[in-house]
Curated annotation (Swiss-Prot):
GO terms for molecular function: ribosomal small subunit binding. This is Ribosome-binding factor A. PROSITE patterns: RBFA (PS01319). Monomer. Binds 30S ribosomal subunits, but not 50S ribosomal subunits or 70S ribosomes. NCBIfam families: rbfA. HAMAP family: RbfA. Belongs to the RbfA family. One of its GO terms (cellular component) is cytosol. Pfam families: RBFA. It comes from the Bacteria. GO terms for biological process: maturation of SSU-rRNA. It comes from Bdellovibrio bacteriovorus (strain ATCC 15356 / DSM 50701 / NCIMB 9529 / HD100). The keyword Cytoplasm applies. The keyword Nuclease does not apply.
Amino acid sequence: MKNMGDGRRIARVEREIQATIAQFLIRGFKTPLPGLVTVASVKMPADLRAAKVYVSILGDEKQQDEALDLLQERAFEIQNYIGKELKMRYCPKLTFYLDHATEQVLKVEKILHELELERKANNPGEGSDESDDE
């Protein structure tokens, strides 16, 4: 039976690796990445020997592909940085994946905004009551 502390340890290591990769992208990445890159999350198995790194990249599809390719090309360098910073017994093998969650949130917000504008256009007197309460 697994120890309950193992799950907490894995989560802690995932957070530390996420922060360390983000730090590397800010300080150690010499080549400018296309788009705005954010490390969204890191997922690791119990043995901590691999890490799936989910990144959110704001930009068009070409920028996203270029940034993801560049991250994967430099994965070994990032792994070395993690090894030095975190002093882990085994440095995990990094694999980068595009995280679509941020993109989906932005799409939903845009749709909600458009619906709100449409509602106000169909009911012009409805939105002006808010200033009367002050």
